[in-house]
Amino acid sequence: MSSIRLADLAQQLNAQLHGDGDIVITSIAPMHSANGEQITFLSDSRYRERLGECQAAAVVLQASDLPYCNIPALVVANPYLAYAYMAQIMDTTPIPAQDIHSSAVISPQATLGKNVAVGANAVIESGVVLGDNVVIGAGCFIGKNTRIGAGSRLWANVSVYHNVEMGEQCLIQSGAVIGSDGFGYANDRGKWVKIPQLGSVIIGDRVEIGACTTIDRGALDNTIIGNGVIIDNQCQIAHNVIIGDNTAVAGGVIMAGSLKIGCYCMIGGASVINGHMEICDKVTVTGMSMVMRPITEPGVYSSGIPAQPNKVWRKTAALVMNINEMNKRLKSMESKLEDENE
């Protein structure tokens, strides 16, 4: 949608309108740059003083911030959530494909639902089942016997290997690879012997997978991504990982094989998580953490050393390098004190 009346937007957001509802909104913008045709939002009351300088046509805010506002406003309980829905309403992103392109290679043994679109040079192999309103972008590869649920969209150059199952309303960004071989090898006197990965990948409904993320197929059982999971760009999900419903994974995360993560977790960017263990529900792992042991209690977990001035970091590193020697000296001193007190 390219434009909308403020009153109509208020109705769709279930917001209270204050001011002229006939104003036409053309787009959304940050508060500092919004102009007289754009709407903005205030999600943090600490910045309410910016309302006095705001040049937007209207603003979305909480009721407690309304007295500080001198332009038309939409009052909601959660402005940031309203912003998300507002962005969906006004989204002008083109879909990955409009129809079935003449250069697409589609097996006669594939089954396509109603209103399926397939972009240029995409390959759909035999046994594939695409649900209604599925969109496959240009250059995608969909391997044998894979099933993709209704309403799912794949942007250009996504590779989905054989026997993968993907639910409804999923969104897969360009360059993602789903169902590639897990890293499975046996050692025969120094020679690596490949173990064919005989499992697959099962993806639930409403899952989003970022650009250039890889999800390996299981060795014997399946790699499983639960409903509502969101995975950012350039993540590595190894074979037999299980991610519970509505967990969020930020960019650059590496998950080793056979890891099980619960529901409603949040994994910060560039974190590394060991395999063959379990993380319970409702765990937050902050960015760049290294998780080596199971987590059995909900909460926030962190590791690593935040950036410091180089001189400070060098001193800290020197202390860490010498900590064993310092510990020996401390124990020696304690022993001497005990002897003196006897």
Curated annotation (Swiss-Prot):
The keyword Cell cycle does not apply. The gene is lpxD. This is UDP-3-O-(3-hydroxymyristoyl)glucosamine N-acyltransferase. It holds the Pfam family Hexapep. It comes from Photorhabdus laumondii subsp. laumondii (strain DSM 15139 / CIP 105565 / TT01) (Photorhabdus luminescens subsp. laumondii). PANTHER family: UDP-3-O-ACYLGLUCOSAMINE N-ACYLTRANSFERASE, UDP-3-O-ACYLGLUCOSAMINE N-ACYLTRANSFERASE 1, MITOCHONDRIAL-RELATED. GO terms for biological process: lipid A biosynthetic process. Keywords: Acyltransferase, Lipid A biosynthesis, Lipid biosynthesis, Lipid metabolism, Repeat, Transferase. It comes from the Bacteria. GO terms for cellular component: membrane. GO terms for molecular function: N-acyltransferase activity; UDP-3-O-(R-3-hydroxymyristoyl)-glucosamine N-acyltransferase activity. Its EC number is 2.3.1.191. Pathway: Glycolipid biosynthesis; lipid IV(A) biosynthesis; lipid IV(A) from (3R)-3-hydroxytetradecanoyl-[acyl-carrier-protein] and UDP-N-acetyl-alpha-D-glucosamine: step 3/6.
